[in-house]
Amino acid sequence: MFRSKSMTSKILLNYAFTFIVINLADSASMVIDGLITSRNLGATLLAATGLGDASYEMVSLFCGIFAVGLQATCSGALGIGDSKKASRYFTSGVLVLAAVALVTTVMGFLCLDPLCRLFGADGSDKLLHDGLYQYMRGWFVGIPGFFAFTVLCPLVTLDGNKRLVTAMTVLQSALNICGDYFSVLHWRNDGLRAIYGIGFSSGIAFDIVSVFLLANFLRKRSAFRLSMGDFSLRAVREMIHIGLPKLTQCFSNLASPIVINRTVLAVGGACAMAAMSVKASVAGFFFVAGNGIAGSVQLLSQVFYSEKDKKALGETASVALRTVGVLCIGISALLFALSPLLAGLFLNAGTEEYRLTVTLLRCFSASLPLNALNSCVLSFLQGTRKILPAHLYIVSHRFLFPALSTAVLGRLFGTTGIAVAFPVSELLVLLTYAAIALSAGRGRERTDALLLLPENFGYDESLAFSVTTIDEVIGISEGIEEFCSSHGIDKERSVYSALCIEETAGNVVEHGFRMDNKKHCCDIRVMLEDGDVVMRIRDDCRYFNIKERYEVLKSKGKTSGIGIRLVYGIAKEANYISLLNTNTLIIRV
């Protein structure tokens, strides 16, 4: 829907920045958590927390599926202006997740000892077993909050309150770190109590911030409403179907290091494995930009796909490509330059491990822009509900090509081949996908083929404009009247459609643009659907619900708000949606 590239860029970059901050806070919290544990509790209890990470992955598997599916279904419903449908998905997802979170919490506490053995603490090292037991006993208190945090963050962002998501992510990290410090200082001489406190601080932090996230949906302007009568098993099945690629991703993430590490050990031994460990330690910080852009792409593509806005999807891809080109290449160059310094933080300079780590990090730096592009492609596939291609892409990107590249290049070129395998595997995934997509879409526009858009996707008869002045609004309204008349719409509705645009868009330009000193844009899209004229007017000004304003005006004198009264008198249907920090009005005449 966003017709101007400036608005598309603004929305994408704003949300990318939000996701980058979230990922950075999460990565920093994990690193600081590890440093506090290792320096105060020793290597064995640090290993216990490392084994405990598997429990996070296990819980993430359950709630991650719903998080992806719920975001996709809700954004799709809001994209077409159906807030009731969005609330039905919201209610169904939240109620099921509450039940699953409760069951997971109870089962987690009942199965603490079996989980310890499953994750590798079989009791041969009593301190390791007891440390893992206490760590999970502490953090399992936060399973409900972890579920809520994982699932609600995307919805709160979609609801236009990304500042709250950023603030709660930072707060969660801060509470976690403060709790860790308190635990190691208060139970300095009791490692098991301290490790319990570290786990508990992580869990309770999720519980605390989830309360604030839930409070977002009590706002009057929130697009989501929880209603027990809206529960639908069909909606739950749809969410699970859309979110299943998350399951594939988890299994691929588990299988990939197992296979790759065997090759690394066979080719380079402990020296190569040490270099891989250093790379794993720093990778999270350098992936945040690509993951942030990809998260923003997924959010926008879900909305635009539901709106059947082919051009907006193409613009989103173009903006994402440029952003990756500028931001991720810059980060790649930074990592290349800092590789010796980073290697020196973990290993002694001059050793074989140090030399190999520098080579590995520099080759890894070359893969960052390619990885960001692959993440964006996957986000498009998930955002446009290409479920099977998304499954195949995940397996190829997360497991198949990395494992094959490492095995082949490692056998041919030794440890250097292992390092080069990072950018090579990323490039092979991109080239393979592009070749298959272009071959399958032969004869179509390149962008449509690469995005796997259906041949009949979008509206054959439509207009799209961006306006910034009242003169542009008047000129466009005349063009809309001509467009409607030339496509078989009767004269009365053609004139009414032009009047609706002139009143609504004119109101945005005359009043909305002047509410602050920021630069704004108003995007207009007109489509013909089932014999009706459908108009979407979207602006990035301050919140203004025209429907609420109309209800207020009805109680006042007949001369109050004539323009808004005129629009609602003309329209067959008019819906307002606050979406992605924008005002969207959908009018059907």
Give the location of each predicted region.
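Short alpha-helical transmembrane segments in multi-pass integral membrane proteins
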Residues: 1-19, 74-142, 186, 191-243, ...
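Transmembrane helical elements of multi-pass membrane transporters/channels
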Residues: 14-33, 138, 149, 172, ...
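Short runs within selected transmembrane alpha-helices of multi-pass transporters and secretion channels
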Residues: 26, 67-68, 138-158, 165-176, ...
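Helix-terminus/linker motif at the lipid-water interface of multi-pass membrane proteins
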Residues: 28-47, 116-126, 182-193, 254-281, ...
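Small-residue-rich hydrophobic transmembrane alpha-helices
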Residues: 46-106, 149-165, 275-333, 373-393
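Flexible, glycine-/charge-rich segments associated with ATP-binding catalytic modules
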Residues: 449-463, 569-589
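Conserved short strand/loop->alpha-helix "switch" segment adjacent to the catalytic nucleotide/phosphoryl-transfer site
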Residues: 481-502, 556-557
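Glycine-rich/acidic phosphate-handling loop/turn and adjacent ATP-lid/helix
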Residues: 534-561
